[in-house]
Each structure stands twice: as C-alpha cells, then as structure tokens.
Amino acid sequence: MNKKTVRDIDVKGKRVFCRVDFNVPMQNGVVTDDTRIRAALPTIQYLMEQGAKVILASHLGRPKGKVVEEMRLNAVAERLSELLGKRVVKTDEAYGDTVKAAIAEMNEGDVLLLENVRFYPGEEKNDPELAKAFAELADVYVNDAFGAAHRAHASTEGIAHHLPAVAGFLMEKEIEVLGKALSNPDRPFTAIIGGAKVKDKIGVIENLLDKVDNLIIGGGLAYTFVKALGHEIGKSLLEEDKIDLAKSFMEKAKEKGVNFYMPVDAVVADDFSNDANKKVVNIDEIPSDWEGLDIGPKTRELYRDVILKSKLVIWNGPMGVFEMDAFAEGTKAVAQALADAKDTYTVIGGGDSAAAVEKFGLANKMDHISTGGGASLEFMEGKQLPGVVALNDK
C-alpha cells in the first residue's frame, strides 16, 4: 500500500483523532454484535502503547444531522471499555469547548470517544468548517474506518486536509487484501456475485470480468441472466431493463475466456415465505406462478467444485433468501465450500456475505472478511475511495 500508516509517524504525547467504524447493531441500549469494535482494537491498542492521546470518532446509524437519543455512542463506549480493560471517556458532543476541555485532561495512553459524528448535518455534507473543527481537536489524523472510506464526509475526508493523515491497521489490511486480489491475484481466481439486484452489481461484474478466471452468479439477480438466455422464470425477481446488459456480460465473458457459471437448478416456492410449498426444478422449468428463492443441489455441487479448484475466491452477495431457513442451503453450501477449500485464499466482501458466514458459524474459517459492504463493493468496481485518497502518500 502506498499510503502512510500509523507505523510511519511518531504519536507519543500527541492528540490523535482516529476515525473508526463503530456502526454496530444495538438493541435496548446494548451492543448486540461487537465485531466492528474488535476490528479496530489493534490500531487503538497500538496508539495507546505508543503514548498517544486517543480521540475516537464514529457514526452510528442514520440520524440525518440531528441528535437521536438512541443513536448516542454511550453503549459503544461501555463495550470498548470492557474490551480494552480501561475506562473510555465519552463526550456528549463531537467538537467544541467541552470536548477540548475533556481532551486537555487526557494523559498519554488515555482513550476518549466523541459523540456520533452524524448528529451534525455538516458531517455527510463534508462541510469544511466542521472538518476544521474536528482537526482543531488533534495533532494527527488516523483513518481506520474502511467501512466508511467510500464516503467523502467531514470525519473521513475533509479533516485529512488539515492534519498529517495516515491509515490504521484495519484500513491497511483491507486495502492490501482487496488490492492484491484485483491487481495481482493468485489463479485460478473466482468471483462469486449474488444478492437481489443486477443494478447493484453492474460495476463489480464489469470490472471483475477483466480480472477473473471464473465468475459465479447466484441470488435474485441470477434470474435476469436466466431470462436473458430465453428461459421462463415464473415470478422470480426480474429486472426487465437489465436483460440486454446480462446478455452482454455473458458475451463479454466468452470473448475474454472467462468461465461464466449460472444456476442449473433452483429451489422454487409458491409464496415468498419460510412456510411456502417448495420444490427443486431445473433452471429452465420454473412453473409460471412459482419463484426461485435459492440455488438447487446440482448448482451447489457445481459451484463447490469450482471453489475447491480456485486459488483465490472473492464472495459478494448470498445465493438465496438465506434469512429464511427454507432457502438458506445454497448460501450455506457456498460458505461451507469456502471453509473446506484449504489451498484457497477466501475473501468475503462484507455486508450480507459476512452476515451469512457468521450465521453459519464459519467466519473463523475465512481468510479475510471485509468490514465494509459498500466500501468493498466500490473498491471491487475499481473506484477510488475518497477516505483513502485523502491519506498521505508514503
């Protein structure tokens, strides 16, 4: 990675504004999944050990520029205190005189968590005044929030213009793993693209067709490709306006010598519910009033074989409606194949795929699980991420 990291600067005695991604699920004022908090610990602990005064900033949810009581970060501060074994001071604002006073009280190795940065309308607008106000709190800026790196916000991009700006360890790992996959992959390189909508994955498919050996398609978006081949798909998800695009993707794959894998059978149901009647049919035999909600057993075997023969696999998007147990088998089979693939480097592209490997208890068998759904998607589209671009070059 050609960006400076926390290793490249001296932080002893300095106030370090560290943007993290603590956008964690909460219920009744308690953090229900602390994965993202844990992911930031190596950077936080390193800064503490180096004698920095660590000022943490994060968003939580979508308060839309105003204070929403249940989106305060108090519960996050409590959980972080437990994980660090040290009291974390939490302020009720994210900048201003009371925050400056709290920072003035800090000793080397202390940790302070600012209030939810999205309580201020200027955050998502990347307001230069707010960016300056954040910068006034610190001597150094560290961005460890890969999950927000695709956003040009005041705390992810604007602030970096006012302070020495470097990447944290999580940001560094994300960029290195995804960067190597896209620029210098081990082969055979397979991408598995699922999810509901073709339109959400157009950029990714376009970019990956130039890089992969195998492209595997699943999830709701597969039915637009099935339709493009001239098959009837019943009531399955269809994007009429993307049929021609699906055709062109398949043609491009052929031109480039990319193996393009699509479902050969499907689990169909007579209703979108866990209790619906369901059956397995060949992909060209979907009944007119049924809908495909998962890949079938023949497809699972086919995809498993491709995965086991690959040296690198990136997975983004589920194979079916895995939130319903009746239609989770396809997604589970892919997760299991990745777990069983011993000589394969497995990269899970955040979002639903990350949730799926967690759900099936296979997360610890994956080589890299991205912490950013949207950010990893844009990175895989070949886009520059504003939060990364703004950091100092080596």
Curated annotation (Swiss-Prot):
Q: Which residues carry this modification: Phosphoserine?
A: 183
GO MF, any single term: ATP binding
Give the UniProt subcellular location, in the record's own words.
Cytoplasm
InterPro entries, per database record: Phosphoglycerate_kinase, Phosphoglycerate_kinase_CS, Phosphoglycerate_kinase_N, Phosphoglycerate_kinase_sf
Modified residue annotations for Phosphothreonine:
299
A Gene Ontology biological process term: glycolytic process
Write out the transmembrane intervals.
none
Q: What is its EC number?
A: 2.7.2.3
Q: Which reaction does it catalyse?
A: (2R)-3-phosphoglycerate + ATP = (2R)-3-phospho-glyceroyl phosphate + ADP
Q: What is this protein called?
A: Phosphoglycerate kinase
Family affiliation: Belongs to the phosphoglycerate kinase family.
Describe its assembly: Monomer.
**What organism is recorded for this protein?**
Anoxybacillus flavithermus (strain DSM 21510 / WK1)
**Residues binding ATP:** 201, 292, 323, 350-353
